[in-house]
Amino acid sequence: MKVVQLKIENFRGIESAELKFDGHALLVGSNNVGKSTICEALDLLLGPDRLNRFPPIEEYDFYNGRYLQPAQVEGEDPTPVKIRVEALLTDLSAEVLKRCAKHLEFWHIAEKRLLTEGEVKAATPGISIPCLRLETVGEYDPAEDEFNAETFYIHSPDAIEGEKETVRRDIKRLFGFLYLRALRTGSRALSLERGSLLDVLLRLQKVRTGLWEQTISRLKGLDIENDAAELEPVLTAIEERLSSYVPASKAGRKTKLYVSQLTREHLRKTMAFFLAMRDDQEAVPFQQAGTGTLNTLVLALLSFIAELKPDSVIFAMEEPEITVQPHTQRRIADYLLTHTKQAFVTSHSPYVIERFTPENTFLLARAGSGKLEAMCVADATGLKENDYKRYSRRGLSECMLGKGVIIVEGSTEYHALPVLARCLEGEDSALNPLDLAGVSIFDAESDSQIPKFAKFFQALGLKTFGFYDVKQRDATEKAKFAAVLDVNEEHKYKGFEQMLAAEVPVTRLRAFLQDLLDSGVDAAHYKIPTTLPTDDAAIKKLIVNVLSSTKGAGWSARLLEQCQSSERPTTAVEFLKKIYTYFPLPVVTPATGASAQTP
C-alpha cells in the first residue's frame, strides 16, 4: 500500500497543498514549513484511532484557527470552513482489494493519473492498477457546538446522490499506517494506551482480551491488607464513621484496597513497561532508561510490527535522529527503506538524509502565505546521483536545509571564511550571523564544479554565492558562473593563500610564523627556518608555502583569528559584506518599562 497523491486544505499551517509521491519520502525544509503537518494529515486520514478521540479535531487544527467563514449578508449565519485531506492509494493488499472492491478506481501507471469515464480500455493490467481514493472532512457543527471529522470513500457508487460512504475503523487497520510523532520520547509508544505501539502489537497478536481479563481477575484476588496489618484499624475506623452518615446493610468489610480501578482503560494508563540493560541492573520503568535506549527500543517495536504486517505498513516518523548516535540513525533509515511499503520521514540529519535517493527526497517550501509546495530533489538539474551520494554527508544535506550557500573551491577557504565571518559578526552587532541566517559553506573541491553545484542549489530556491581563484576562462565559461551565482566573486589571486599573503600586513604574517615556531611545530617538515627572514617578500613566499601544506587549511583560519580588524584581507571581507546584505538582521522592538529591567 502506497500513497501516491496527497491533497490538504485548511489543516494546521497549510491552507492548500497538492503533493505527489513515488514510494518512500524524506521531507526536509525549514522549521514550521509543514513537515509535521503532512504526517498529522496522513494520520487524520489513515490512522485507525485518530478520529475516535473526542473531539477528533479542535479550533487550531483549522488553518489560522478559522473554522467559520463570516456571513456575506448581515443577519445570516456564518458558514463552517472544512478541513479536507485526500489521498490516492495504490499497491493495495489482497484483503483491501476484496473488502473495498466497489470503491476501486484505476491509476494509469505511465502517465501517473486517475483514469476517467470513457477510458475502460486502459483499465487493464500493465497499463493501469487498482487504486483507492479516501477523503477526511472535518468541520464545526454550530447546532451541537462541537467539531466533527469523518473519512469517506470518494468513489461511492452505492451511496445516495451527494453523499459518500464512510471508511470503517476495521478497514483503516488494513492500511497499516503507523505514526510516530517523535522518537524523542517513548512515554506513549511504550505504554498500553489505545493506539500505542504496544497496543498495536497486542491487537495484531490477538491477545488483548485474555490479557485484560486475566489481569483484572488476578488483581481482584490480590489482598493488600493481608500484607499490611496496620491498615486494618484505619479502614475499620473509616467504615465506622461512614456508617454514621450512610447506612450500609452489607455484612462484614465494606471497604477494600485495590492497586487500580480494575477497568481496562485505567489499566492501560497504569501498566508500565520495565526493562534491564545490564547484568548488574534490576528491571526499572522504561522512563528511567536513557533517551537513546528508549528510541532504539521504539525502533525494535516498529520492526516487530513490520514483520507481522510485511505487505501493508506505512510509517510516518518525525526526526528519528533525536538523541541517537549516527550509526543507529543510519540503521533506522535503512530499516524503514527496506522493511516498509512506504515511509514518510522528517529529518535534519545528514546520516538519515544520505540514505534516501534524490527521487525520494522532497524539499518543502512556502509559495505564498498558506500554500505548501514540495520539490523533488531529483528535479534539481545539474547534479548526478553519484555526486549527490558522495557529497550528501559532506555538506550537501546541511545546505539543502538553509537559505543560502557559499560555494568555494578548496578546504582552505572552507575553513577560513567561517572564521572571518565570526570575527566580523563579533565586532558589528548590525550583522545577521550567517549561521542564524541559514547560510552554509560548501566545498566543491574545484572551481570547475562550482557551476554544477550552484545550479543544483539554485534550483532548490537557495541564494548562491561563489568565491574562487582567478583563472583563464573564455566568455562561455564565465557565463556559466554568472548564470547560477547571486554573488559571483572571482578574486584576482591565483589562490586563497596568495590573497592572505598579499592583503594581511607582513608584521602579522611574521608574528603568525613565529607563533607556529613557538608552539613546537615541526619546522623542518614545513620548511620554516628557525630564524625568520627579515625580507618582506621572503615572509610572503614562506607564508604561501606554509598555508599550502597539509595543515594549511586550519592554519589559515588560525591566522585570521589573530588578525585585528584593520589587518583582515579586504577581498574576502568585502565578499562577505555582500552576502550580509541579502540577510538583514530582523528588527527587534526593544523592551520597555518593567519588562526591560534585568532581574
Question: Language-model features: where?
Answer:
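Extended helical coiled-coil dimerization/tether regions that scaffold
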Residues: 189-192, 199-297, 301-313, 476
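Acidic, Mg2+-coordinating catalytic modules of nucleic-acid enzymes
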Residues: 394-407, 411-599
